[in-house]
Amino acid sequence: MKPLKILISNDDGVFAEGIRTLATSAASRGHKVTVVCPDQERSATGHGLTLHSPIRAEKADELFGGGIKAWGCSGTPADCVKLALNELLDQKPDLILSGINHGPNLGTDIFCSGTVAAALEGTLDGIPSIAVSVASFQWKNFSFAGKLSLDIAEKAIQQNWPKNLLLNLNIPPCEEKEMGDLVWTRLSIRQYEEQFIRRVDPRGNTYFWMAGEAVKDLQSAGEGPKGWPSDVSQIALCSPSLTPIQPDLFWRGNLDDLPNLI
């Protein structure tokens, strides 16, 4: 296939190993790669935008090499993609990749994900986009995730990419030889036991750390193929999960069940 113009972003920041692996993987296949991502950790910022302070962008080519153009930006992941598409890029990209995230983006956690938000900006602009995550905060080998991401992207881009389709890829933290097959999955509904740790600073002011953990994963959110496993259950089986999602959040339940409000 002819080389693609690929924009890559993330929410872990310009120094993260995941984004460097993804950019290098794409460039090694002959694609024209541009990285525009936060200049620091911006995890769990969701689709937030910077509206009350300037966004600064500094060149960061030296962090990547291999002909990859890169910027580190002071804004959120969504800011980065907006800035890239409207100011930094000479041409519209053929593909947007977001990641490789250091940690999972499964189920309804995607609403908090800066990784998914960056990819969603591409989807909203009509650009084929994929969010990529390794489902562990400790796993540091991103080479297979980079390879699989590009395999999927190249295969999908040669087909008729449906309008409003965003692909969310999660890869289990295990060696390639131990993995099961890649399958289509549904989004789980993740329920958490929220915890806040209360502390007092040296000046006597109270502050909090948010903690908590997932205590329940319901099989699926919304409508969809009943035979598909959930993304959480697929990762638990040490198999990659590929979930099709879209920006349209319109409720698809029975309209007769809506409250009588109008």
Curated annotation (Swiss-Prot):
<keyword id="KW-0547">Nucleotide-binding</keyword>
<protein>
    <recommendedName>
        <fullName>5'-nucleotidase SurE</fullName>
        <ecNumber>3.1.3.5</ecNumber>
    </recommendedName>
</protein>
<dbReference type="Pfam" id="PF01975">
    <property type="entry name" value="SurE"/>
</dbReference>
<feature type="binding site">
    <location>
        <position position="43"/>
    </location>
    <ligand>
        <name>a divalent metal cation</name>
    </ligand>
</feature>
<dbReference type="InterPro" id="IPR002828">
    <property type="entry name" value="SurE-like_Pase/nucleotidase"/>
</dbReference>
<dbReference type="GO" id="GO:0005737">
    <property type="term" value="C:cytoplasm"/>
</dbReference>
<feature type="binding site">
    <location>
        <position position="11"/>
    </location>
    <ligand>
        <name>a divalent metal cation</name>
    </ligand>
</feature>
<feature type="binding site">
    <location>
        <position position="12"/>
    </location>
    <ligand>
        <name>a divalent metal cation</name>
    </ligand>
</feature>
<dbReference type="GO" id="GO:0008254">
    <property type="term" value="F:3'-nucleotidase activity"/>
</dbReference>
<dbReference type="GO" id="GO:0046872">
    <property type="term" value="F:metal ion binding"/>
</dbReference>
<dbReference type="GO" id="GO:0004309">
    <property type="term" value="F:exopolyphosphatase activity"/>
</dbReference>
<keyword id="KW-0963">Cytoplasm</keyword>
<feature type="binding site">
    <location>
        <position position="101"/>
    </location>
    <ligand>
        <name>a divalent metal cation</name>
    </ligand>
</feature>
<dbReference type="GO" id="GO:0008253">
    <property type="term" value="F:5'-nucleotidase activity"/>
</dbReference>
<keyword id="KW-0479">Metal-binding</keyword>
<comment type="function">
    <text>Nucleotidase that shows phosphatase activity on nucleoside 5'-monophosphates.</text>
</comment>
<keyword id="KW-0378">Hydrolase</keyword>
<dbReference type="InterPro" id="IPR030048">
    <property type="entry name" value="SurE"/>
</dbReference>
<dbReference type="GO" id="GO:0000166">
    <property type="term" value="F:nucleotide binding"/>
</dbReference>
<comment type="similarity">
    <text>Belongs to the SurE nucleotidase family.</text>
</comment>
<dbReference type="InterPro" id="IPR036523">
    <property type="entry name" value="SurE-like_sf"/>
</dbReference>
